[in-house]
Amino acid sequence: MDKERILTPAVVFSVALLHLAMVALLWQAHKLPVIESGNVIEFVDLGDFGGGDGAPEGAGAPAAPEPQPVPEPPKPVEPPKPVLKPVVTKKADADIQQPKEEPKPEEKPKPEEKPKPEPKPEAKPVPKPAEKPVEKPSEKPAEHPGNASAKADSEQGNGEDKGTGTKGDGTGRGEGSGKGSGGVKGEHGEGAGSSKGNPLRANGSIPRPAYPTLSMENDEQGTVVLSVLVSPGGHVESVKIVKSSGFSRLDNAARKAAQNGHFQANAWTEFKVPVKFELN
């Protein structure tokens, strides 16, 4: 047992030495060789140490230029690779050829229909107010002087002369009555008596009054009786409402029409004019 214990450390030590020797050999074998650079020869000037050339003493020769690095050789330029173009192969035409579809014609947009204008409502005709003929006005003419025989003849020769008056839309016609040199009365007409001299005549008419729009919308109807005072020569001096229709718009329309009336009178004459407003 003791021998075995002594041999064991000796064996371990010897093995370790062998390993170290092998490692040293391998290290020497793989050691890289050192490339020695070329010898540089330096020239030393053995001239006068006093610097005879004017250079300061102790100045040596200029240092040799450092060796320039050797440029690396240029890398070879690779030629460009050729670009392969795709080869298009045409397929053989099939025996059965289908007819090509013809393009469908484009549908033209239909023109837009213009909206039809709405029919305008027809304006209803304005009803025309019916007017009655002008009533017989009262006239007071001045008496004309005459001889006694003329007065007697006039008193004995009183007579009546009747005439017809026409009715029309918007206008009225009438005559006044009065005593003349012949003492003749006229009713709704013109005439002369059997006495001597000329009778006094008075007649006239008014234009058709316009029917007020608001009165038409409110169904206003009625008759207006006017008193028209006319001066000698036929000029309208004043218009008064004797009887109202009940609606101020109708009364004003009748009065305005009477102010524009046409009358014939030889003296101051007052006419009674009825104006009727009626909706059909």
Curated annotation (Swiss-Prot):
What GO cellular component entries does it have?
outer membrane-bounded periplasmic space; plasma membrane protein complex
Which residues belong to any copy of the TonB C-terminal domain? 196-280
Task: Provide a GO biological process annotation.
Answer: transmembrane transport
Regarding the membrane, this protein is recorded as: Single-pass membrane protein
**Basic and acidic residues bias: start-end ranges:** 90-143
UniProt feature, compositional bias: Pro residues:
64-83
Q: Which UniProt keywords apply?
A: Cell inner membrane, Cell membrane, Membrane, Protein transport, Signal-anchor, Transmembrane, Transmembrane helix, Transport, Virulence
Q: Where do transmembrane segments lie in this chain?
A: 6-27
| InterPro entries named among the record's database cross-references | TonB (IPR003538), TonB-dependent_transducer (IPR051045), TonB/TolA_C (IPR006260), TonB_C (IPR037682)
| Cellular compartment(s) | Cell inner membrane
Question: Whom does it interact with, and what assembly results?
Answer: The accessory proteins ExbB and ExbD seem to form a complex with TonB.
Q: Which family does it belong to?
A: Belongs to the TonB family.
The protein's name: Protein TonB
Native source species? Neisseria meningitidis serogroup B (strain ATCC BAA-335 / MC58)
